[in-house]
Amino acid sequence: MNYLNIFRSSPRIRAGLPFDDFDDSGLPLLDVSHSHSLPRAMKRPIATADFLCQQSRSRPFWRILLCVAFGVLFGTFALAPSGLFHTSASFAARHAVDELYARQSTTLAQAAARYTLRTGRAPPPRYDRWFGFAREKKCLIDEYDRIHRDFKVWYQLAVHAPTHFQEMIARATRQLDGLAADISGVEILNGSVSITGSTAYDDNWPRTISRFSQHLPDMTFLINGRDEPRIAFNYRALGAREAALAPKDSTPFMHAPRPTVEFFAQQSGCNVPAQATGIMESVNGDSGFLLASAKPGYTTDLYPMLSMSKISPCFADILFPTEYYYDRSWWAPHFSHPDNIPWEAKKDLAYWRGMSTGGMIIGSNYHHFARFRLVDISRSRPDLVDAKITLFAETLCAEGCDRTAVMAEYNITESRREPREDLYRYKHAIDVDGTTFSGRFLGLLRSGSLVLKSTVFEEYFNDWLRPFEHFVPVLPDLSDLAEKIQWANEHPEEARLIQQRGLEVARRVVTDDQNDCYFFAVLVEWAQLLEYTKIAGTN
């Protein structure tokens, strides 16, 4: 790395200014191999030691001092290349986030124009209030393509049937009356939030929504309280418009096959590819959710419902931020103290600890679940992976499940659980699906370790946290996990850059305020679709 060249073009060095007037803030320690991501002002080479020391006999005494100091400094840098790269990786990561915020709209007119360009329609009536809230909270303004994708089908249907959105909400409410389906109905009336339902989050959601409910019109919406998505409807299939407008599921949200493998095999769009490109290879046999979902309860009609995760195009749920990703929430996994171990002192291993979740254990199907497979890899490659199941999920042991045998096979002793902060001792952290999404992703990104993530699920932040840029993706069957860890160990600078980028986005972008802005934006779209019913009623 040519760190010296960065110094050479400093105007003060070229002008021969006195040392006391020299500002060393112009000397960032940068890895020029990543200079494409740096500001133009930082893409400058530095003076060599020869340049600094030449003709020192005829120069003022300060040049001799500078020459000596520079030699000592350069020698120190040469002995600590990892520290230098950490500085440049941190800078590049910070700069990428700075650029993200710099390109956001700064006026309502600009934001509205970009919204229209992306969606083909004018912003919803309450968009100005959302914009003011987002600016106050320093949120992203233009980066909500995930929301636009989730709602597009409903806007398409509204062209032909403007009251259909409201009708399906009413239909769901009637169907759910008296059923323990883990679905809550939320009502906003004059800015106050009330909730009816039977989910674990009914005490949390009203507090979250109340942070912005005063800006929303009176409305009702539905939230799925299960980790699993619920709307098993492929709106990308031929004939989807007609099927959506003619619902026929007589028991919505009550389809609960055990196991679920045959149900998904027969559902349109639910044969999930292991990779986005290349020859089609199904992941259905490698996902605990698709094999034997822990708590199924689906509908095969298209209903509007907010959910924490989904698989596209198998499911058509509308994504929103789960409480697991609010730092202020009890549900969020917290570390008791920040990372206090230098990167160089961390082990070149990938770390994971967790429960035996993944799907309902029926016979020996658990061998295909990601968490059990991860422990198998750890046993065969202890030089790369340190993974253990620390707690057995009793509720997922169904008929045909031999609890004692499973615990013995995977040495699940349920002894004292290891502190979450043990992760700090490892350079790499593994994130794998449990019942659905793990809920750990943001915490792992903030931990100081490089995250290797394997999942079949989509979440609301997927457009902001991208594979190969902020984390290292791993196939659902974990067949490339060892290869990816080896790559990280053999390319420490590139791995460190990915780690720093993920850390920076998780800390600065996906914050509680940003989650509120996302949730608020979702409900602004929901309110717009409800407004179509009112407009149709007045015409």
Positions of predicted regions on the chain:
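Short linear sequence motifs
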Residues: 12, 44, 108, 336, ...
